């Protein structure tokens, strides 16, 4: 009896020690839960509409994975037609967007971090003073000419635009937000997409609108 009790006690101590030495595993960063809310708060003011800067639409997972383009949506002096690049409509999947000239901002390029990671790092390394006048060399407004560097052109961009990291012309991400996004990018920027499911109230409202518009 004593031997059994002693054996049980030793086993309990060993198990307790092993559990105590087990490293805590941080929960995986979720695009839907952790990343999209940051992009919505800090990025979509410039990167959400059809005419978003560099056509980089960060209002949805589809836009983030589509990437950026050097071709502006609106060109007043254009004399020939250009194929539209409407998200959700004119291409499906990353490869179709790559065929239309879009390049990734989420994928690492060999030993180089993702373009988004480097843009955020550039902005984080040169923070702006809150509630202060913007530096003269940061040009904003309707006549601003957006520069849309591809991943291989980032070093030249950073050299000529040292104060124009992302987010542009604002105080930027908090340290926690910056750490979360950079960790997600370093881990491969996996995007978990969740289908939008309307609530019962929203579904009823949609049905009401459809009935109204179909009369």
Give names to the regions the model predicted:
Residues 19-215:
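Aromatic- and Gly/Pro-enriched helix-to-coil junctions and flexible linker segments
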Residues 4-17:
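Bacterial N-terminal signal peptides
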């Amino acid at each position: 009896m004593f031997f059994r009790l002693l054996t049980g006690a030793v086993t309990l101590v060993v198990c307790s020690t092993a559990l105590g030495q087990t490293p805590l595993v941080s929960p995986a960063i979720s695009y839907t839960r952790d990343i999209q809310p940051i992009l919505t708060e800090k990025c979509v003011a410039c990167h959400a509409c059809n005419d978003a800067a560099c056509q980089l639409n960060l209002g949805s997972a589809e836009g983030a994975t589509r990437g950026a383009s050097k071709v502006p949506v609106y060109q007043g002096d254009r004399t020939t037609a250009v194929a539209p690049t409407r998200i959700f409509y004119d291409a499906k999947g990353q490869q179709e967007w790559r065929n239309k000239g879009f390049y990734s901002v989420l994928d690492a390029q060999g030993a180089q971090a993702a373009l988004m990671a480097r843009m955020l790092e550039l902005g984080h390394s040169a923070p702006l003073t809150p509630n202060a006048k913007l530096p003269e060399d940061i040009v904003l407004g309707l006549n601003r000419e957006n520069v849309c560097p591809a991943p291989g052109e980032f070093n030249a961009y950073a050299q000529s635009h040292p104060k124009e990291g992302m987010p542009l012309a604002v105080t930027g991400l908090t340290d926690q937000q910056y750490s979360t996004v950079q960790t997600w990018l370093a881990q491969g920027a996996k995007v978990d997409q969740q289908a939008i499911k309307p609530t019962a109230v929203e579904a009823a409202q949609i049905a009401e609108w459809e009935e109204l518009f179909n009369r």
